[in-house]
Amino acid sequence: MVGVAPRIETRRARDCPACWDLSAPEKATQVVARPRMDEAPSPEECMAHAVASLQHSDLMSEIPTSDTFQALMTRYAPGYRRSRSDTFPLTDPTLTASQLVSQAAQADHWRRIVSMTKEYILTSVPHTEAPPASDVDTLLAWWHLRLVSLWKLHFFSNLQEEMQALWQVLESVRVYEGDDLRVLVDTPHVSFPMHVLRAQVLLQNDRRRGIQLLWKHMQRAKEASADSIWRARYIRVALLLSSLLVEMDALPAATSLADELASGLGSADAKLALVLCRLYLQMSDMASASRMLSRAKSAADPADAALHAAILNHETMTRFISEPHADHEKLVVDDLKDVDQALTNTMALDAFFHGHVLESIQILERLMHEHPTTFTTTRALAPNLLTLHSMGANHPQEEKQRVIRFLVQSAGDDPWFVDQRAG
């Protein structure tokens, strides 16, 4: 079964070599002095060229016909054939484009969003001789949404291909910024989140370069962190960078970042304290993890049931890691009204490890029926439930068929397309 993290591997710190100079200098921002007006293109011409360049259909790749959901169906229901409804954009003349996208995102229909963003990139901005600068902002916003959707679908090869193609445009097209002619990538048109996403994509093939860019973006956000928006950006990038450094066993650098975030914790930063708790657990720093857990408890709003569930989940993980071979009492959370998916999976694993397979099944079944969207879009839950049913004594094949039909129905497809031999 796929666990939330009842056991986190202890990592040994490696010497941080000199080549990990995360503050490596970047090349200077390209600023092209504005030449005489009889030689230079006009601002309107530059903007029109930028808009046209961002709307090239060649920048977008062909999307695969299968995704994570399809892979699950292929494994457990080989006769299943997905309907075409999820591969086309939603249409409703009463809703705006942003409302349609919001609906699709809430339902985790990222494939639909990919289809919609392609249409909007190609058609939402008309070709004119003097487009406003906001047209570039609009197109880049749709591009950002498209790239995030590809990430959500785990279409990483498509993501890398499209990001590379887009970045070539951003680094070659020039627009005016005041009296200077700059490459588009160095202007405010390219948002901070887009820069961070590009660094994350680079991590797939060039981890060192990706980390250096994340470090650069983190420092930029830190310098402006007096503003609440930039502080939130600084925290997000610092957490991302810390996690990557832990994965690389660069524990001194990861610890330094985590300690810096911990020292700046406010009285209401319960959620951040929990994230830091998890980071310290991954680094096997039990003392710091316990300290962050205590900070989260003291800062938590008693009325926030979801936060209470997350705290309980981290308490459980800390207990398992501290004493992995101890015979712990079973985890009981009957008083919680809202249980998040991570805690639910931990509860199911806890029951399973105590030999209570049927109780483990009941815990996951309850979440499946009460929160179907959460269940069908969380990767560990469905495989774990199907695995548990395989261990059950009462008609495992029929039970797995029932779960598969529920998953298909929740995805908006016809459940009777599932092969009767599945399971």
Task: Identify the function of each model-found stretch.
Residues 124-135, 172-189, 221-232, 262-267, ...:
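Flexible helix-coil transition and linker loops at the boundaries of alpha-helical arrays
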Residues 289-423:
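Structured C-terminal portions of repeat-based eukaryotic scaffold domains
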Residues 97-103, 145-147, 152, 190-201, ...:
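"A position-specific structural signal for the A-helix of alpha-solenoid helical repeats
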Residues 113, 159, 210, 254, ...:
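Single-residue signature of alpha-solenoid repeat helices
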Residues 216-299:
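Solenoidal tandem-repeat scaffolds enriched in leucines and small polar residues
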